[in-house]
């Protein structure tokens, strides 16, 4: 079809010389035929060379598939039991059940052989056969335990053949006993117990000598013995065809007969048959236990793995062909005997096969051939297994067998010699158990490798899958229970004990095992399914930032206890501006911290992060830690090293005005536990030392963690913590004190949204939760108990607060003692709030550079009562009033309102000048009214603390986060409010909080101590606080009644808390309390950052080890 494009006006068709008329033609010229010159068919194929003649094969002189696997497997499976016990088993079970038993046994063998073939073709197989394959697949615990069991099975198999060979030997060459027919071939050997033991010993020693010469000699002997055995088996159906029927000495032979076949078709269990050792009637279980060893020699070829040229090829091929050959032989023998020998003859004669044979000496030679080779292979295979176990050094005490194969062969020979004291049937049952146990574990190994989907499990043998391996393992277990359930249970118990022994006493191995692949598969699967949305299953998942393990050793170990089955990550930051150059250093640090983890014996992951700065490194570690639902929910950071900071910066703001401190009489002494001394070199000693964090960086870390909604824990003084060990016990128990201090405010109404009371109930409960978790750790449970300490400002609140906390602890199922104290019992509080001068010097030294404190002191000095004289001049009164106004305004700017009480104390004697003082009383009343006015200060976004007078004492309106340090230092961070009432959501499921704090009606009182959260309507009206007895009462009452703990600036609050805790927790081992987080942007101002850190330092000074906690998530629930 011709394009219509050229029919548009203004277009023209290009000339034919430039363009082809075919518009769809390719822009490139057609490829010339001559350019395709490579012909793959002409490449000569590499000629296949047998491994026996391959000059590059270092094992070319070793055994191949036929002589190394097929012959040993055939000779070992075609056991002496075929000649000694097939007549007995066929007479009891009949042809159908015997063939069924044969099919069951060979099904187990075939499925196990498929597993052996798969594992052996997945890599290089060295000496040890089944042990080597299992140990490298399932690990040293499984390999060592099953290796010992398999070793004993091989030993008992050799012993069974050594004992079993005596019967045909005496039948053919022994002296005839009285009443018994003469020997078949000649009377040469005397009978008797010790004679028989001597014959077996001599035969065993001859077999040991052949095995001692070497595998090549065993191979040559095996080829000859295999031909003899094949001729012997071939003679059985041949005799059934050519020999005429006869009856001789109670033994009858009918030849091939349908009647005989019909009579022998079904089972007929009897007792007392020849070859039976049971006093009662035979059972299927006992017969299976005797029959199975006749088919269980499939590991004979695999046991020769160290002597094979190419084990991965020879083991599957030789074993499968050996199984097929032996199954045909057994089936032919069963049908030949079943259709030609009457059942009575099968009951009465053990050597019935030789008795009805046309060439009896051939049967005797076959019996000798299979027995001798089974003994040789059994001892040699067992010796190889023992040598392999010894070389792997997984069981202590076997090192001697690793030096020379001769030692393991001699030891195997001695153990086999001990088996000669037992009976064939008993040995056969034990061999069944050991072989079946080996089958179970071999199939299990292949099954686990298959389901683990390990990329490197790619066996060249493809005729297996997870179903064949699972069925093989299951059938093997069922077969064990069929034979003897008690023996199977005992063997399983022995396996478990061996497993545990190897697990705890064997040195670590670098083989790797399938458990790693399975763990990976399951972890990936369940990590994708893991959710953290249900509070019921909350657990601490800790990220601990550590710089130097020497200074944080106790904290590292403490967090390991605190995690209580949760996630634990050791985080470290390496600051680098040039990542490629520092990559090797990062790898070195990663390895070093992993060694630190192992030295500390903690269950933790290691996360080493990097960044151009410490802050970015912290962010990277936090964001990159964990996987899926296993992400850190608590970040632990050590407290800022303020002492080192002051040494390096002596002109810090805090030291410029630092005065001589006056110690309180009852302070907490320093812990008797010295700093942690680690006298051994640590792996991190060789790593690069990071620059010390500065105060602004430390505050920014806390801000960032809060911004990323992480629960934060600040650890202080943990170098003095004495961590209990497993052997410690203590009575009475030591104390862990909990101070769940409230930080609450009020969110102002905005539009349609009503005002709401806010509390730090999440932090409150997390403190209780972590402490409760810690005392469930066995080391802490035996040595420590919990104590919850609360404080209120008024004595009448104590009872109510105690009841609420006990109720909360009962709901949370936490066992702890509850103490509630009143702040007016403590000196620092009385000095700051009530003007008590008892520790004024100490408080003044701590608050010397605090403007709020200066103004308060000056206001109190101005309002200090003076003696009233009737001659007082009005000018003095006016001057005093003016000065009071001035300082009243100064204090008022700080958000503090005072209510002055003009009532005289009742115990004062009235002066005659009372009327003259009326004007002064009026003026002071004016001052009181002025002080009662509330003022605003910028401290937090839309947050206010509400006084109990009903007026807003501090209107917290933040318009700019970057307020100056003087303003920030005035912010109250704690509250003395009583514990909020809580409501339990009874139908909760754990997805949402089931314990909810209730905001109760706000009651006003006249003392301004608290916001009223948690106060019920039933509470009586508060009583005004009494004046300190140290205050002068000569004139007007000058107590500033509305000043309370909630009104104090942060520094003063921290000082009060320090006094409370030093008095209450002087003998405690550990303290948990609330962490006030800095406002966002605090780190941008050095003085504000330093003020925040110094406030915390004032609080924690002289205290036992403390952990300050801030939570942003609910961690407790009452849901089932």
Curated annotation (Swiss-Prot):
Q: Name one Pfam family in it.
A: SLC12
- The portions of this protein that span the membrane are 63-83, 86-106, 146-166, 194-214, 222-242, 284-304, 318-338, 361-381, 394-414, 431-451, 463-482, 488-506
MF term (GO), any: potassium:chloride symporter activity
Write out the entry's keywords from A to Z: Calcium, Calcium transport, Ion transport, Membrane, Phosphoprotein, Potassium, Potassium transport, Transmembrane, Transmembrane helix, Transport, Vacuole
Chain positions with Phosphoserine modification: 34, 654, 915, 918
Q: Does the keyword Metal-binding apply?
A: no
**Region of interest: Disordered:** 1-21
Q: Which GO terms describe its cellular component?
A: fungal-type vacuole membrane; vacuolar membrane; vacuole-mitochondrion membrane contact site
Query: Could you say what a knockout of this gene produces?
Result: Affects vacuolar morphology and decreases survival upon hyperosmotic stress.
Q: Which GO terms describe its biological process?
A: calcium ion transport; cell volume homeostasis; chloride ion homeostasis; chloride transmembrane transport; potassium ion homeostasis; vacuolar transmembrane transport
Q: What kind of membrane protein is this, topologically?
A: Multi-pass membrane protein
Q: Could you tell me where this protein is found in the cell? A: Vacuole membrane
Q: Hey, which stretches end up on the Vacuolar side?
A: 84-85, 167-193, 243-283, 339-360, 415-430, 483-487
Any signal peptide, and if so, which residues?
none
Recorded hits in Gene3D superfamilies, A to Z, give:
Amino acid/polyamine transporter I
- Explain the purpose of this protein: Catalyzes the coordinated symport of chloride with potassium ions across the vacuolar membrane. Involved in vacuolar osmoregulation.
What family name appears in the similarity comment? Belongs to the SLC12A transporter family.
What PANTHER family does this protein's entry cite?
Answer: GH08340P, SOLUTE CARRIER FAMILY 12, CATION COTRANSPORTERS
From the Swiss-Prot or TrEMBL record, give the protein name: Vacuolar cation-chloride cotransporter 1
């Amino acid at each position: 079809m011709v394009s219509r494009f050229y029919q548009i006006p203004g277009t023209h068709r290009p000339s034919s010389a430039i363009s082809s008329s075919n518009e769809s033609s390719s822009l490139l010229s057609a490829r010339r035929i001559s350019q395709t010159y490579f012909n793959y068919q002409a490449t000569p194929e590499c000629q296949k060379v047998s491994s026996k003649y391959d000059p590059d094969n270092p094992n070319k002189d070793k055994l191949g598939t036929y002589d190394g696997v097929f012959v040993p497997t055939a000779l070992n499976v075609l056991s002496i039991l075929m000649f000694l016990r097939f007549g007995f088993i066929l007479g009891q079970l009949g042809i159908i059940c015997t063939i069924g038993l044969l099919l069951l046994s060979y099904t187990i063998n075939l499925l196990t052989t498929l597993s052996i073939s798969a594992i052996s073709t997945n890599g290089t197989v060295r000496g040890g056969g089944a042990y080597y394959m299992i140990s490298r697949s399932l690990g040293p615990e499984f390999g060592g335990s099953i290796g010992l069991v398999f070793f004993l099975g091989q030993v008992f198999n050799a012993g069974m053949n050594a004992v079993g060979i005596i019967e045909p030997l005496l039948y053919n060459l022994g002296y005839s006993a009285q009443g018994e027919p003469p020997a078949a071939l000649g009377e040469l050997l005397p009978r008797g117990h010790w004679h028989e033991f001597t014959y077996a010993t001599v035969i065993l020693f001859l077999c040991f000598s052949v095995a001692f010469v070497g595998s090549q000699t065993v191979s040559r002997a095996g080829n000859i013995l295999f031909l003899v055995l094949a001729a012997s088996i071939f003679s059985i159906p041949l005799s059934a065809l050519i020999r005429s029927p006869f009856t001789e000495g109670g033994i009858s032979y009918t030849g091939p007969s349908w009647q005989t076949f019909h009579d022998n078709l079904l089972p007929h269990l009897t007792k007392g048959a020849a070859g039976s050792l049971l006093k009662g009637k035979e059972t299927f279980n006992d017969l299976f236990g005797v029959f199975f060893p006749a088919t269980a020699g499939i590991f004979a070829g695999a046991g020769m793995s160290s002597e094979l040229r190419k084990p991965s090829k020879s083991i599957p091929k030789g074993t499968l062909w050996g199984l097929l050959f032996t199954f045909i032989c057994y089936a032919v023998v069963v049908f030949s005997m079943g259709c030609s020998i009457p059942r009575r003859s099968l009951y009465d004669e053990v050597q019935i096969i030789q008795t009805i044979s046309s060439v009896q000496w051939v049967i005797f030679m076959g019996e000798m051939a299979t027995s001798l080779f089974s003994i040789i292979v059994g001892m040699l295979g067992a010796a190889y297994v023992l040598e392999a176990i010894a070389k792997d050094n997984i069981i202590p005490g076997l090192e001697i067998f690793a030096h020379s194969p001769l030692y393991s062969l001699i030891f195997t020979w001695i153990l086999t010699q001990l088996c000669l004291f037992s009976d064939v049937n008993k040995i056969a049952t034990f061999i069944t158990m050991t072989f079946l146990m080996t089958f179970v574990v071999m199939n299990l190994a292949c099954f686990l490798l298959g389901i683990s989907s390990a990329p490197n499990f790619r066996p060249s043998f493809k005729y297996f899958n997870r179903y064949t391996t699972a069925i093989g393992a299951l059938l093997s277990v069922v077969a064990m229970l069929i034979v003897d359930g008690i023996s199977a249970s005992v063997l399983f118990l022995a396996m478990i004990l061996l497993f545990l022994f190897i697990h705890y006493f064997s040195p670590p191995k670098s083989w790797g095992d399938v458990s790693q692949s399975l763990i990976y598969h399951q972890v990936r699967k369940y990590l994708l399914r893991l959710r953290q949305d249900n509070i019921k299953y909350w657990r601490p998942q800790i990220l601990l930032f550590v710089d130097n393990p020497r200074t944080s050793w106790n904290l590292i170990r403490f967090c390991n206890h605190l995690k209580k089955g949760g996630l634990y990550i050791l985080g470290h930051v390496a600051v680098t501006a040039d990542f490629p150059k520092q990559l090797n250093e990062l790898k070195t640090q990663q390895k070093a911290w992993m060694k630190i983890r192992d030295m500390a014996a903690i269950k933790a992951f290691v996360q080493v992060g990097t960044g151009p700065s410490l802050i970015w490194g912290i962010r990277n570690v936090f964001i990159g830690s964990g996987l899926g639902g296993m992400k850190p929910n608590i970040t632990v950071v050590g407290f800022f090293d303020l002492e080192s900071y002051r040494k390096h910066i002596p002109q810090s703001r805090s030291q410029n005005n630092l005065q001589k401190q006056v110690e309180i009489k009852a302070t907490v002494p320093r812990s008797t536990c010295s700093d942690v001394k680690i006298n051994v070199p640590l792996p991190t000693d060789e790593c690069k030392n990071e620059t010390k964090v500065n105060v602004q960086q430390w505050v920014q870390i806390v801000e960032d963690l809060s911004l990323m909604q992480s629960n934060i824990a600040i650890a202080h003084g943990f170098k003095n913590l004495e961590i209990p060990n497993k052997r410690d016990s203590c009575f009475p128990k030591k104390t862990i004190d909990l101070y769940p201090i409230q930080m609450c405010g009020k969110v102002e109404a905005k539009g349609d949204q009503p005002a709401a009371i806010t509390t730090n109930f999440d932090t409150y409960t997390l403190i209780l939760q972590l402490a409760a978790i810690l005392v469930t750790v066995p080391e802490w449970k035996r040595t420590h108990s919990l104590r919850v300490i609360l404080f209120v400002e008024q004595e009448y609140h104590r009872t109510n607060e105690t009841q609420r906390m006990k109720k909360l602890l009962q709901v949370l199922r936490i066992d702890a003692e509850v103490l509630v104290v009143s702040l007016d019992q403590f000196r620092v509080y009385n000095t700051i709030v009530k003007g008590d001068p008892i520790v004024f010097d100490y408080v003044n030294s701590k608050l010397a550079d605090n403007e709020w404190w200066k103004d308060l002191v000056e206001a109190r000095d101005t309002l200090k009562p003076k003696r009233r004289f009737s001659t007082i001049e009005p000018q003095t009164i006016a001057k005093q009033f003016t000065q009071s106004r001035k300082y009243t305004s100064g204090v008022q700017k700080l958000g503090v309102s005072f209510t002055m009480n003009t009532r005289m104390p009742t115990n004062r004697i009235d002066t005659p000048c009372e009327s003259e003082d009326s004007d002064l009383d009026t003026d002071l009343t004016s001052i009181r009214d002025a002080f009662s006015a509330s003022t605003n200060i910028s401290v937090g976004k839309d947050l206010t603390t509400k006084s109990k007078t009903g007026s807003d004492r501090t209107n917290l309106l933040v318009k700019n986060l970057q307020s100056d340090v003087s303003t920030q230092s005035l912010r109250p961070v704690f509250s003395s409010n009583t514990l909020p009432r809580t409501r339990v959501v009874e139908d909760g499921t754990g997805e949402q909080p089931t314990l909810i704090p209730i905001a109760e009606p706000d009651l006003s009182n006249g003392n301004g101590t608290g916001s009223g959260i948690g106060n019920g309507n039933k509470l009586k009206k508060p009583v005004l606080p009494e004046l300190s007895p140290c205050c002068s009462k000569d004139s007007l009452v000058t107590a500033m009644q509305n000043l309370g703990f909630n009104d104090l600036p942060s520094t003063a609050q921290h000082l009060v808390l320090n006094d409370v805790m030093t008095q209450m927790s002087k003998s405690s081992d550990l303290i948990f309390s609330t962490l006030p987080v800095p406002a966002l942007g605090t780190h941008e101002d050095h003085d504000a950052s330093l003020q925040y850190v110094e406030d915390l330092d004032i609080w924690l000074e002289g205290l036992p080890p403390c952990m300050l906690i801030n939570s942003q998530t609910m961690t407790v629930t009452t849901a089932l």
